[in-house]
Amino acid sequence: MPVLLIVVDGLSDRPIDGKTPLSVARKPNLDRLAEMGINGIMDTIAPGIRPGSDTSHLALLGYDPYKYYSGRGPIEAAGVGIEIKPGDVAFRANFATVEGEGSIFDKTVVDRRAGRIEDTSELIKALREIELPVELLVERGTGHRAAVVFRGEGLSDRVSDTDPKAVGKKVKRCVPLADDAKAKKTAEIVNEFMQKAHEVLENHPLNRERAEKGLLKANALLLRGAGEMPHVPSFKDKTGLRLCVIAATALIKGVGRVVGADVITPEGATGNKNTNLEAKVKAAINALESYDVVLLHIKATDELGHDGDFEGKKAFIEKLDEKIAPLLDLDFSKTCLILTADHSTPIKVKDHTADPVPVVIVHEDVRRDEVSSFSEFEAYKGGLCRIRGMDLLNIALDLLNIAKKFGA
């Protein structure tokens, strides 16, 4: 009896004039799921703590992020297929656009996503040719994202980001966060890479072509989330259950690989608003035949929240609603379906917030409540009340009568 966990990234919002994209979207299928299940709100980490997508997904799978999270870099790197070794220092990277004179650290960020560039494969090839005192690994992620790994003796993840995390600010120098030789050495290597990467990208033919077309150059990399790979017990060892993750986004694929899940990326799944939702839903339904837990990740709502695009987010929710229709035909005497988000990405904030997210659990044995609409304004009225992300899977396993008893 499997669990289907659907995580719609950044789905929920703070109201604008009393409305959110989710509350005003036409979504009969999402509303039907709310009507069929037990509803509530959820703090994926804890009240008032703004979750990352990585930490929240760890929590949703039952892993304490305060114990197992060591930075976004190694998870992102795992997601793009880099095998992280002991001592490696991994970063998450964005291709970005910078302007100004002088070194990379004198230049100002004008777009942290380089106009949402889609294909960076040629740029990645050029970056791999950079020579450093240590081995360099660079892999393409989804869209403007990438992963950068430094491999060598005497490195440390106790170093700062180079991403200022805002436009209009200068690129940051990497500085050691510990008073030791390893951190100082690593910071120096990161700064050397930053400058050399900028020189390679600024003069790359692809960027000259982009400039001629009036597009933003992807002429810098912004690094953040330095980390070394932690020891994480596999989901199978931890729970005795087989896990499958269906995702296109490198970070979520990385979470899956870190916990030992099988990861599936259906054809046409992109992690943006043009993703092949039909293929992802079909893959999830098929996976329920072979796995105990299937995590289906949907990314575009988060991207549209970061862009501050109310109408775009609303439209994508309506598209998602249409494409999940086949899930209503599942046998809920044998399957537990959970629909939720990993965090809020409000239109007015354009970033993650700690606002609790709506959640509904559908199974024939749930104590159905009177909620009939899936939204931020209705979910809190439901019978689940307010839960934590780490509670979610336990609740589902209890409904399926495969939870272990605590005590005599």
Curated annotation (Swiss-Prot):
Optimum pH is 7.1. It catalyses: (2R)-2-phosphoglycerate = (2R)-3-phosphoglycerate. It is an enzyme of class 5 (isomerase). Keywords: Glycolysis, Isomerase. Pfam families: Metalloenzyme, PhosphMutase. SUPFAM superfamilies: Alkaline phosphatase-like. GO terms for molecular function: metal ion binding; phosphoglycerate mutase activity. Its cofactor is Mn(2+). Optimum temperature is 60 degrees Celsius. Does not lose activity after 120 minutes at 60 degrees Celsius at pH7 with 50 uM of manganese chloride and 5 mM of magnesium chloride. GO terms for biological process: glycolytic process. The keyword rRNA-binding does not apply. InterPro entries: Alkaline_phosphatase_core_sf, ApgAM_prokaryotes, Metalloenzyme, Pglycerate_mutase_ApgM. Pathway: Carbohydrate degradation; glycolysis; pyruvate from D-glyceraldehyde 3-phosphate: step 3/5. Belongs to the BPG-independent phosphoglycerate mutase family. A-PGAM subfamily. Monomer. Catalyzes the interconversion of 2-phosphoglycerate and 3-phosphoglycerate. This is 2,3-bisphosphoglycerate-independent phosphoglycerate mutase 1. It comes from Archaeoglobus fulgidus (strain ATCC 49558 / DSM 4304 / JCM 9628 / NBRC 100126 / VC-16). The lineage of its organism: Archaea, Methanobacteriati, Methanobacteriota, Archaeoglobi, Archaeoglobales.
